[in-house]
Amino acid sequence: MEGLQPVRSLFTRFFQLEAASGLLLIAAAVLALIINNSPLSYLYGGLLDVPVAVQVGALNIAKPLLLWINDGLMALFFLLIGLEVKREVVDGHLSKPSQVILPATAAVGGMVVPALIYWFINRDNPAAVAGWAIPTATDIAFALGVLALLGKRVPVSLKLFLMTLAIIDDLGAIIVIALFYSGTLSSVSLLLAAACLLVLVAMNRLGVIKLGPYMIVGLILWVCVLKSGVHATLAGVALAFCIPLRTRNAESSPLLALEHALHPWVAYAILPIFAFANAGVSLAGMTVDSFTHPVPMGITVGLLLGKTVGVFGLTWVAVKLRLAALPAGAGWGQILGVAILCGIGFTMSLFVGSLAFAPGSSEYAGMDRMGILTGSFFAAVIGYAVTAMASRKTNVA
């Protein structure tokens, strides 16, 4: 389509960015672990507990720095996810039903099976069961970054399969957060949020293409959603769906412009900051029994085994029932490798974990992070090895 940046260039830039940011995410997580397990641990905890307040008239928002990161910065991350989902649905791979069936089926399996495994392991503990959604998430930056390390050894169709699967997985995570991880609701704030949403929709329908007005109303929407009891990050998704992809003269795309501007900030600043703030697990007093506790065990097994069985299993079923075909040029070994890579939950799992087990108010807050880091690490290493070996055999064949 004329006026819109070609899908191929967006796709190439996307993978280049995610591959580089994945290394930064790892560095941020490792740095957090080192600092929080050193004599400087008091600085780490103290920094995240620093109170930050914003007051405008009667409106007062006071939170520790950690919650500003999780509720504020991550709203921009979800804004970017929403922009990517809308672009793919309107003018990308999610706009063609035939191309959606396989990754959508795989994504469903990759959410249901890990959740069932976690529930089964923690079924006798109602408080621990609250973390059932933690192993259902996939970190799109890490998963695509690891796959990008294989370069041209994997077909583009396989990368598209993983990207589409991860986007659908993110959409599923958004729905889960909205339905299961919202607090006590405020009817007044919800009505104000609905009014903001109506204004955004009206602006879209009236052909407003300047991003400024959308950002201003979006900020007000975020405040209303924050005060409503619904998780504030969902305001980013709602705003994204109202940003126009196309304009009447087709000379520019507000959505693509915003996506282009946000991508480096999210990849190189927001996600690393989030990883640093949430990955600092204290290893003091940790033993083998700590890893075999039902919470970290459920998360680790859910990510590593559940994702693999769910994604690979339902992909196999869809292909055998002739509902869809394998990505062009990809073999079953590569599909298995990608299924394992989907077990890299990291940032998304950490985010869901912060909702299920709030830091400072839940005894499982550190345990969930331990399971996430363990499961994600082994999923990355094993997934890379399996995909690399399968790609070598495919190339030889």
From Swiss-Prot:
Protein purpose: Na(+)/H(+) antiporter that extrudes sodium in exchange for external protons.
Per its record, how is this protein called by name? Na(+)/H(+) antiporter NhaA 1
What organism is the protein native to? Pseudomonas putida (strain ATCC 700007 / DSM 6899 / JCM 31910 / BCRC 17059 / LMG 24140 / F1)
Q: Which gene encodes it?
A: nhaA1
Q: How does it sit in the membrane?
A: Multi-pass membrane protein
Subcellular location as annotated: Cell inner membrane
**Region forming the signal peptide:** none
- Keyword field: Antiport, Cell inner membrane, Cell membrane, Ion transport, Membrane, Sodium, Sodium transport, Transmembrane, Transmembrane helix, Transport
* Pfam families, A to Z: Na_H_antiport_1
What GO terms fall under cellular component here? Answer: plasma membrane
